[in-house]
């Protein structure tokens, strides 16, 4: 019981932190704009702030969405350890809080950044995201997210022999994939694969 309470406290802190939708709140407060009403998909995410309001305000919302994941995880590791399986809930809580209304990409990176410098697990998500956004592009974006997170969780289970981190990463992956799966199902958009580089030598040979 003594071990349970501290982890539950940080889990609640993380969930509440994740529940604050900065990409909806800040544009509403300072720009008097409801980002869910003016965006194409109605998602209260930083990407829609970039697209509909501008890069400077988009960066502000992005940082807030990332840091709301970093802070509870980093605070928990300052006082506790990830040796307890309950740490998996601390890791997943900000993502679960955000996913009630959003797609939870930025906050997922945030919780993984909160593990630094003890774990560089964030790279296992960043690398497939970059790869599938530049060299081989999976479109629409929701498909890219799903495939990147599936690569992430497979890599975690191969490379990270820590049960709490494996379970936490699995909970994060299930949450994000489920949210994007709902979007894919609602829009009926099919997967398209494009090369992100320009194979000029192929064109010259033609």
Annotate the PLM regions:
Residues 25-56, 184-206:
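Cytosolic, membrane-interface loops and tails of multi-pass inner-membrane proteins
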Residues 50-53, 76-79, 97, 105-137, ...:
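Interfacial segments of multi-pass membrane proteins
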Residues 155-206:
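C-terminal membrane-associated helical module and adjoining short loops/tails
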Residues 120-127, 141-149, 160-173:
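Loop-to-transmembrane alpha-helix initiation sites
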Residues 13-24, 93-100, 134-139:
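Transmembrane alpha-helix interface/packing and boundary motifs in multi-pass membrane proteins
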Residues 6, 57-63, 67-96, 116-120, ...:
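Nucleotide and nucleotide-moiety/phosphate-recognizing core
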Residues 2-31:
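N-terminal signal-anchor transmembrane alpha helix
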Residues 1-11, 139-141, 147-159:
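Long, highly hydrophobic alpha-helical transmembrane signal-anchor segments
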């Amino acid at each position: 019981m003594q071990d349970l309470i501290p982890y539950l406290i940080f889990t609640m802190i993380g969930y509440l932190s994740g529940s604050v939708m900065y990409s909806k709140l800040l544009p509403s407060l300072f720009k008097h704009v409801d980002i869910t009403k003016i965006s194409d998909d109605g998602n209260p995410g930083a990407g829609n702030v970039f697209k509909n309001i501008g890069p400077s305000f988009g960066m502000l919302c992005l940082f807030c969405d990332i840091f709301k994941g970093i802070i509870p995880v980093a605070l928990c590791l300052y006082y506790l350890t990830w040796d307890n399986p309950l740490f998996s809930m601390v890791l997943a809580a900000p993502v679960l809080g955000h996913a009630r209304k959003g797609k939870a990409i930025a906050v997922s990176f945030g919780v993984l950044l909160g593990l630094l410098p003890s774990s560089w697990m964030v790279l296992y998500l960043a690398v497939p995201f970059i790869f599938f956004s530049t060299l081989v592009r999976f479109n629409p974006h929701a498909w890219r997210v799903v495939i990147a997170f599936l690569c992430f969780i497979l890599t975690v289970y191969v490379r990270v022999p820590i049960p709490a981190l494996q379970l936490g990463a699995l909970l994060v992956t299930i949450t994000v994939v489920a949210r994007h799966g709902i979007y894919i199902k609602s829009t009926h958009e099919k997967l398209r694969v494009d090369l992100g580089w320009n194979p000029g030598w192929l064109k010259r040979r033609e």
